[in-house]
Each structure stands twice: as structure tokens, then as C-alpha cells.
Regions:
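C-terminal cap of thioredoxin/glutaredoxin-like
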Residues: 241, 245-246, 251-253, 262, ...
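N-terminal export/targeting leaders of redox proteins
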Residues: 1-121, 163-167, 173, 183-193, ...
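N-terminal juxtadomain amphipathic helix
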Residues: 128-129, 149
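Inter-heme linker and motif-flanking segments adjacent to c-type heme-binding CXXCH motifs
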Residues: 119-122, 145-147, 182-187, 205-218, ...
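An extracellular/luminal cadherin ectodomain-centered signature
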Residues: 194-201
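Extracytoplasmic electron-transfer domains, predominantly the class I c-type cytochrome c fold
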Residues: 103-108, 112, 116, 137, ...
């Protein structure tokens, strides 16, 4: 405001001086003392114009003389899916449209998903909470790949009443389930910077998805049950021919050069997911593998048959891995999935059949009126 006042005062002073000079020239002309006709008329007019413009700029709201802004094209929703299509996560370039603080939080959340071990692993820079795997090892492409165990329906379906715990669970509780089971670690503080960042990322991914809606392509594809039990021996053959190049002959995975995390995760052993993880259920592991493994596979162009997929799942989940106390799981045992491998059950099928199948007879039992 101060510079505007200074300009107005300066223009007024100039106007006064010009009027004085014009009057002086007029007197000199009348007495014949001025040989040529001199007038300040045009200078005075120009100064008045400048004064009016300056006064208008000073009094009118800021931006009154600016050209009308051009409205940007409306941004499509973050969620990119249609009823007849598949959900996939948005391009992170869209984060630039958010305020700086929220953008930074979401980007940090995404980085925690892709490089979990660097922050929370055995040598993590923030804490030492997990087994060295990354969330992205199971939730592909930072949880955005169709049928890649993605996060597309997390925000729309939580809080969620889950049969496994028998409780209404928040997003934070679901994240910590993965921390304690898939990453075989300990829970994050639910109000920590890291948890808030992960939740913000999941909320952003779920933008535009209606509450309680589950778009096609979210989570893991459901495969039809085999009419036989899945066979670990056949699965070993599949593993040897299709999986060893990335996961190693002993399923140990491949570490990054700096030893901070896994490029390809261990499929069993002390650094793999424990027996409480979702992928320890054969249907979950098989559906995940079918659409995504080996490298280069997609849901449209799988490289394994359904039988190979079920068998390799049986082989991997027959190998040793960390245990977990599951006594608090499935308080209503009638709600256990058909492929939950630990009793007790309300049916009479064995734990072995619940683990490897055939599953159709078990499913039929629970469908009886």
C-alpha cells in the first residue's frame, strides 16, 4: 500500500508544478516576453490520466485490471476405472495439484510402501520393525496394479467388520495386520508420521470410489477350485522351471546390492511372511500368482495354467516359515475360509484338506441351508 501512496503524492506534485508553469508561460505570453508559444496543456492532461489510473489501481481490489483467468480443464478422478473395466491407480504426477503438505505426506506414504525395509526393516532409518521385505513385494506397483493385491478398495471398504478378528477394524489396524503377519514384524504406532503417511496414500488411491464399492480388478483374482488336491510335488517342478531365476533355489529371494531390502522377496524361511499372512491361504496365493507371476505375466496374459498355479502355491506354502499365535483369530469358527489350514472347524474335514483341497466339498458343506 505504501508504494501506491508515494506514487499518488508524486503525481499530485507533478500536476501542481505543471499548472504553475502553465500559468507562468501564459503571463509571459501576454506581456510579449515569450518568443514562442509554450503550453503545459498536454503534459497536464497526460499527468491527469496517470493520476486517475494510479488512483484506480490504488482503490480497486487487487487484480481488478487482470485478465480473466483461464480455468484449467477439470481433473479426472484419481481412481481410473469404469463399471466394465478394471481399477488401476492414478499417476503420481497428479499429486502436484494438491497442497504441498498433503502431497509430501502422500509421497512419503508411497515410498514407505515401495521401500518399506529402508525405513522400517532390520537396518531401517526410522525403526527396526519388519523382516526386510517391502509392502510392494506383495502389493505390486505400490498397490496399484490390477489384480496385483492392490489397495483400490481399501478406503471405500474400511472401517470393516472382519471375521478374522471379529471386530470392526480401521485402516490403521489393517495396515498393522500386514506389519505383523506379511512382514513378520511389530505394529506401527497408529498416530506415527509413517502410519499417517501410509493411510494418506491409501485414501488418495481411493478417491472417487463410492463407499462400500469394490471395483473390478481390486485385490486378488478368484480362481476356480481344482477337482483334486493341490500337489506340492508338482508345484516343486513348476517352481524349479519358472520361479528359481528370481526367488532362488531355496526360495531365499534376492537382496539389493546395498543389502537394505529385497529385489525379489523370499518365499519361505525366516525372512518371509508368517503363517498368519493372507498369502498362506492357498486360494489367495494361487490367485495372486495366476495374474502376476512369473515376471511379465498379467491377468490378460498369464504364463501358468490354473493347475500349475494351485500346485506351485501348495509347494511354496508347504515350506517352513515363521509361526504366529493365531488363538485370537476367527472367534466364530464357522466363518473360517475353506482354505484356512488350522482347526478347529465346525465341519469334519481335516486340516490337510483345508490346506491343500479339494476345496469344493468344503465349500458345498457351508452352502447347505
Amino acid at each position: 500500500m505504501l508504494p501506491g501512496i508515494v506514487v499518488l503524492i508524486a503525481l499530485l506534485l507533478v500536476l501542481v508544478v505543471l499548472h504553475v508553469l502553465d500559468d507562468a508561460f501564459k503571463v509571459l505570453r501576454e506581456h510579449g516576453d515569450l518568443p514562442i508559444k509554450v503550453s503545459m496543456r498536454w503534459s497536464i492532461r497526460a499527468t491527469w490520466i496517470l493520476l486517475v489510473l494510479a488512483l484506480g489501481q490504488f482503490l480497486l481490489p487487487e487484480g481488478a485490471f487482470d485478465a480473466d483467468p483461464v480455468s484449467p480443464a477439470p481433473l479426472p478422478q484419481v481412481a481410473t476405472y469404469a463399471e466394465d473395466g478394471l481399477w488401476s491407480g492414478a499417476d503420481t504426477a497428479r499429486l502436484a495439484y494438491l497442497d504441498d503438505e498433503l502431497e509430501a505426506r502422500i509421497r512419503y506414504g508411497r515410498e514407505l510402501i515401495t521401500r518399506t525395509a529402508a525405513f522400517l526393516g532390520p537396518n531401517g532409518s526410522v525403526a527396526h520393525l519388519t523382516n526386510g521385505m517391502n509392502c510392494q513385494n506383495c502389493h505390486l506397483d505400490a498397490g496399484t496394479r490390477p489384480w496385483g493385491n492392490n489397495y483400490g478398495a481399501v478406503w471405500s471398504t474400511y472401517p470393516n467388520m472382519r471375521s478374522r478378528s471379529g471386530k470392526l477394524e480401521s485402516v490403521e489396524k489393517r495396515v498393522n495386520d500386514c506389519m505383523e503377519r506379511s512382514l513378520n514384524g511389530v505394529a506401527l504406532d497408529s498416530v506415527s508420521k509413517e502410519m499417517r503417511a501410509i493411510v494418506a496414500y491409501m485414501e488418495w488411491l481411493g478417491t472417487g470410489i463410492a463407499k462400500d464399492s469394490v471395483p473390478k480388478g481390486t485385490g486378488i483374482e478368484r480362481l476356480a477350485f481344482l477337482d483334486r488336491a493341490a500337489d506340492p510335488a508338482r508345484g516343486h517342478e513348476v517352481f524349479t522351471s519358472k520361479c528359481v531365476s528370481c526367488h532362488g533355489p531355496q526360495g531365499e529371494g534376492v537382496m539389493s546390492k546395498d543389502g537394505a531390502t529385497y529385489l525379489y522377496p523370499p518365499l519361505w524361511g525366516e525372512h518371509s511372511y508368517n503363517q498368519g499372512a493372507g498369502l498362506f491361504r492357498l486360494s489367495r496365493f494361487a490367485g495372486y500368482v495366476k495374474a502376476n507371476m512369473p515376471q511379465g505375466s498379467t491377468y490378460e496374459h498369464p504364463q501358468l495354467s490354473d493347475e500349475e498355479t494351485w500346485d506351485v502355491a501348495a509347494f511354496v506354502n508347504s515350506q517352513p516359515r515363521p509361526t504366529k499365535d493365531l488363538t485370537g483369530d476367527w472367534p466364530d469358527i464357522s466363518k473360517k475360509p475353506v482354505d484356512h489350514p488350522f482347526g478347529p472347524y465346525v465341519d469334519t474335514f481335516t486340516e490337510t484338506q483345508h490346506k491343500y483341497g479339494p476345496f469344493a466339498p468344503i465349500a458345498a458343506f457351508y452352502k447347505k441351508p
